[in-house]
A protein has these predicted regions:
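Membrane-interface amphipathic segments in extracytoplasmic regions
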Residues: 1-240
Length: 240
C-alpha cells in the first residue's frame, strides 16, 4: 500500500509485517481528498482508495510500491520536496509475523497449501526483507532514499510525533488490521533457536547496517563496505 499526501506533504512507503495496513487505514482518513491511496486486499472498513490510476483507469501506483518507483511516477523534484517515511521491525519478530501470515492468512494461504513449519520456513530463507523499498545503490553504496525509518516497536509514540511535525494533530493508530493472523500461534519468539536467529540476522545484515535500529556487532559494522572492512583488518599503527 502507498499513501501520498499532498495536503500534508508526505509519502508513506509500506514495508512487510510492520502494521502497514493499520497505518494506511488511519493515514487515508487524514491524507486529503487529492491523496494517492492504493487499495487494500482484502478491503478494510474505513479505508478509501483513490487517485491511484491514470485517466483511463491504468494503475499508476500499487501496493508495496518502492520509494524509487514512486519517485519515477511523481518526478524527482516532487519526491525530494516531500517527507518520505517507512517502518522497520526487529528481524526475528518480523519473520515470525511473516510466517504466521503465510500459514494463517485466508488470502495468502486460501487452500491451506502452505504447510511449512517454523524450522522449514527458516531453512527456506525467503524472509521479508524490504531494503529495496526504501533504499538504492549509488556508486556501489547502499543509501536510504527516505527521510525517516520508524521502529515498529515504538510506533505509538514516534508516528504521532512525526505527523505532528507535518501538521497532523492528535493522530492515533487505532486500526488493528490483519491481527487475526496471530490468533493461531505456531511459534513464540522464546522458542526460536540461536541457529535460527543467526540465520535470520545474517540475511538482514544489509538492513541492519543501513537502518542502525537494532544491535549490530563489530563484524556486521565492518561488512557495511569493503573499504571499511579492509581498514579495520589492517594492523593498528601501520599504514595500508
Amino acid at each position: 500500500m502507498t499513501i501520498i499526501s499532498f495536503k500534508h506533504n508526505f509519502v508513506f512507503i509500506k514495508t512487510t509485517k510492520t502494521a502497514g495496513t493499520s497505518i494506511e487505514v488511519e493515514l487515508s482518513k487524514i491524507a486529503g481528498d487529492d491523496a494517492v491511496v492504493t487499495p487494500i486486499v482484502p478491503e478494510v472498513e474505513g479505508h478509501l482508495p483513490r487517485n491511484y490510476t491514470s485517466a483511463d483507469g491504468t494503475p499508476l501506483f500499487s501496493a508495496h510500491m518502492s520509494a524509487s518507483a514512486i519517485r519515477t511516477v511523481i518526478g524527482s523534484m516532487s519526491f525530494e520536496r516531500m517527507h518520505k517515511f517507512c517502518v522497520e521491525r526487529e528481524p526475528v519478530s518480523k519473520c515470525i509475523s511473516d510466517f504466521h501470515m503465510r500459514r494463517n492468512s485466508p488470502v495468502r494461504n486460501k487452500d491451506g497449501v502452505y504447510r511449512k513449519d517454523w524450522p522449514a520456513y527458516c531453512s527456506k530463507g525467503r524472509f521479508p526483507i524490504d531494503l529495496d523499498k526504501y533504499s538504492e545503490r549509488r556508486i556501489g553504496l547502499r543509501v536510504a532514499i527516505v527521510d525517516e525509518m520508524l521502529p515498529y516497536e515504538h510506533l505509538a509514540q514516534t508516528l504521532p510525533a512525526l505527523l505532528q511535525k507535518l501538521g497532523v494533530r492528535d493522530f492515533a493508530l487505532k486500526a488493528r488490521a490483519k491481527s487475526e493472523y496471530r490468533r493461531t500461534v505456531l511459534i513464540e519468539e522464546a522458542a526460536v533457536t540461536l541457529a535460527e536467529r543467526r540465520l535470520i540476522y545474517k540475511a538482514f545484515r544489509p538492513t541492519l547496517a543501513l537502518t542502525g535500529m537494532y544491535p549490530i556487532d563489530d563484524e556486521l559494522a565492518r561488512s557495511r563496505h569493503p573499504l571499511l572492512r579492509y581498514l579495520s583488518e589492517w594492523p593498528f599503527g601501520t599504514s595500508p
